[in-house]
Amino acid sequence: MALPSLLLVVAALAGGVRPPGARNLTLAVVLPEHNLSYAWAWPRVGPAVALAMEALGRALPVDLRFVSSELDGACSEYLAPLRAVDLKLYHDPDLLLGPGCVYPAASVARFASHWRLPLLTAGAVASGFSAKSEHYRTLVRTGPSAPKLGEFVVMLHGHFNWTARAALLYLDARTDDRPHYFTIEGVFEALQGSNLSVQHQVYAREPGGPEQATHFIRANGRIVYICGPLEMLHEILLQAQRENLTNGDYVFFYLDVFGESLRAGPTRSMGRPWQDNRTREQAQALREAFQTVLVITYREPPNPEYQEFQNRLLIRAREDFGVELAPSLMNLIAGCFYDGILLYAEVLNETIQEGGTREDGLRIVEKMQGRRYRGVTGLVVMDKNNDRETDFVLWAMGDLVSGDFQPAAHYSGAEKQIWWTGRPIPWVKGVPPLDNPPCAFDMDDPSCDKTPLSTLAIVALGTGITFIMFGVSSFLIFRKLMLEKELASMLWRIRWEELQFGNSERCHKGAGSRLTLSLRGSSYGSLMTAHGKYQIFANTGHFKGNVVAIKHVNKKRIELTRQVLFELKHMRDVQFNHLTRFIGACIDPPNICIVTEYCPRGSLQDILENDSINLDWMFRYSLINDLVKGMAFLHNSIIASHGSLKSSNCVVDSRFVLKITDYGLASFRSTAEPDDSHALYAKKLWTAPELLSGNPLPTTGMQKADVYSFGIILQEIALRSGPFYLEGLDLSPKEIVQKVRNGQRPYFRPSIDRTQLNEELVLLMERCWAQDPAERPDFGQIKGFIRRFNKEGGTSILDNLLLRMEQYANNLEKLVEERTQAYLEEKRKAEALLYQILPHSVAEQLKRGETVQAEAFDSVTIYFSDIVGFTALSAESTPMQVVTLLNDLYTCFDAIIDNFDVYKVETIGDAYMVVSGLPGRNGQRHAPEIARMALALLDAVSSFRIRHRPHDQLRLRIGVHTGPVCAGVVGLKMPRYCLFGDTVNTASRMESNGQALKIHVSSTTKDALDELGCFQLELRGDVEMKGKGKMRTYWLLGERKGPAGLL
């Protein structure tokens, strides 16, 4: 067969200009040119390489050029190193792609290791390449390999408890690349490494070969692995049928990694490897014999990217190579080459960014170890040996009527986990065969002695059996009587009068206590409002001194049938740390309710929707672990399934342990909401598609539906964005439920941010909400899966609890600090508002709860002012203009009086009243403080601008008087600090008898100002005052220039 050496040269350009000193990136491909029986033949892989180059061209500013140099050769370990040397000497490639054949790959890999040149292949499956010694240190296998098949087989043996023996049969002509030998080699080494007795034999393609094979099987093992052509398997099975080796004592694993036996052929239909061009009797014998056969194949990637890639691959193969390829598992190898090229480009780019060079092949290869990324073939995980983790499928005759083979299990190499589809394997005897049954291989065991028993031994044996049967029968009868007694006693029953509530409305079913997480916790149920918001309620009460949760049942009465009694008994029997304890039930109409353990921390839904609670991933994994443990126990209990699992049915107790509630008691369940209500559809967001269709399901189906609900809860915990979060879509619960129920491809599922979440967690979510229930894992598998990627899961229960409590305490401290700061800020605002209404000293007295007594002041100075012509101005202005005018004026005044030792008493309309000398006495400074303030206000008015009448001058009239007053707080609602006395009236008369833009002062004020000798006053004369007679008054003109004043 031809072995072309193809060179793909990629010239990297940055913005169309090559950097100085840069050179082309050379990729040398060494693969068979014409033999399509190889999955790595160039016509199969070439289109994938071209697609990879195009993908790199779209992602990077590169100029792609293909240069080929074809040399004739064979898939030979002798010619391959010669070709490798030629490529190195004449082209100096940066990466070798291939070979896929084992022997050529071994030779070329040794040279590549010496040159420190990366060698990337999706073939070379042999186990010897896994030991990355000095010979193969630059080899990277991005495709399947035999050791990974061995890992899968070892896990199968562990699952079926096969720990002793196995037999291997394979074809090895030694004239080709020995594909069957290298495939089964991985199984042999893995089983031998697990301390099993493993025997192997080459199948002889000659007369008597089938008889030799069955003789080898009888002598060496009940678990048989066969690797060879389908015709070889048919021959062995026909002979096994003749010798009665297909009676269920043996199982035959057929290693058909590319699934050729399951494809349709000239003489067989798809999925029926037993069909062949034989006689009717032989065909029937083969069909019966194949019931004992399990087929192992690679797993075709289920992601839509691979399907699209395969379609493009077939088109390019036809257009570029003139080859018609069919969809098959062989195309997986092309996809692995595609992902390998993109992996190399990604690592090379990182290496250069870190200061490395493309010539540093060892560094590039080391950076590929342990890498995880998503390619067209799904999740690509490289192990520490730079071998890709491989997925496999186990096929069994799932339909005994048609004889069709169907997937029984999927193996994930990345997770080291087997996912059983739920389709039972049709074991002939109903159970898997034993790998080392007694007296089958070890005849030296004394128990295998078949010497007949004596008459006395037979009598003794019969008597013993009779006594045993009598004892068992007595025990069963006693157990039956005790069961009936327990059912009749109704230990679960609670009288309504035994329940105590916090209020007297015992019969009021709507009396729920609204709870908050930071105080007492909240409910187990959620109600959706018309606006889509959740309101959480819990009905709680006391039973025998303990707080309990009470769930009312929307039924008029409960018939105590035998089924209902058994349901209640089972609820009492089921006790587990992660299930809420069932206390009892009240069936007294109309107060029918279920009483369970109360968990004060609230529901999981409450916690996730409370943004003030910080949940790190340790805490989240703890909650997930608790949920998985509870569901695993529930599924293995007599209750078997939940049926309504959702985050509101998961509650957290005082020790931060998550518990599952609202399980069991199917006879008590009823739907209170209308069929088309918003709340009803909101509760169905966690419901599996098969339940939404309304078809009744068996118990196993309900368990798979619980797994779907768990997947939705996982998404809630991961994103904390509510159930069934959809990025960029605003759909009602009804629309979401309808889309899920329709089941159209692509299946409608919540949004996932893969960049922010653990890839394994995302994979678990997707498997949990798979459309086909058989593809969903059970909770036992989920428990093992989470244990592997939860790094904190190994801590003790006490450590975990302490960590949870510490985190919760930190959250509470942070919450208290935030609330305290908010309280202090609001207190400051309230006090500031109070100080604006009342004097500071008076406000402090009121804050201390003291009574403010009226106080007399011997001498204070009072200021009054108003606007001349304000009535006429108001009549010519709108109310809003008047308000704006007064607001602007008094804002200006308030800013000015802050500079003086004065207290603003009040404003009424255009009147403005200020006093100095109270409530804090200031000696004789009250008169000059008011005088200076009045001068400042008069000066400000001269430049004040009226918005709606900018050309008008505002004319202020001011009156000032000094004398004794009495002051105190008046009223309870809107209390005011008021002044009383003749001095107030006199000051008002001084203002009303004054003149515009002048300050009118009394003689007492003039005398107080004269003591300072710095104020300029002018005698006005005697003025007639209403109620006062004639009073001598003065005009305050200003303050003389001096050290402390201005004129």
Swiss-Prot record:
It is found in: Cell membrane. It catalyses: GTP = 3',5'-cyclic GMP + diphosphate. The modification Phosphothreonine is found at T516, T529. Glycans are attached at N24, N35, N161, N195, N244, N277, N349. Pfam families: ANF_receptor (PF01094), Guanylate_cyc (PF00211), PK_Tyr_Ser-Thr (PF07714). Residues 1-16 form the signal peptide. The keyword Ribosomal protein does not apply. Residues 479-1047 are cytoplasmic. Its EC number is 4.6.1.2. Keywords: Cell membrane, cGMP biosynthesis, Disulfide bond, Glycoprotein, GTP-binding, Lyase, Membrane, Nucleotide-binding, Osteogenesis, Phosphoprotein, Receptor, Signal, Transmembrane, Transmembrane helix. Its main location: membrane. Belongs to the adenylyl cyclase class-4/guanylyl cyclase family. This is Atrial natriuretic peptide receptor 2. It comes from Bos taurus (Bovine). The lineage of its organism: Eukaryota, Metazoa, Chordata, Craniata, Vertebrata.
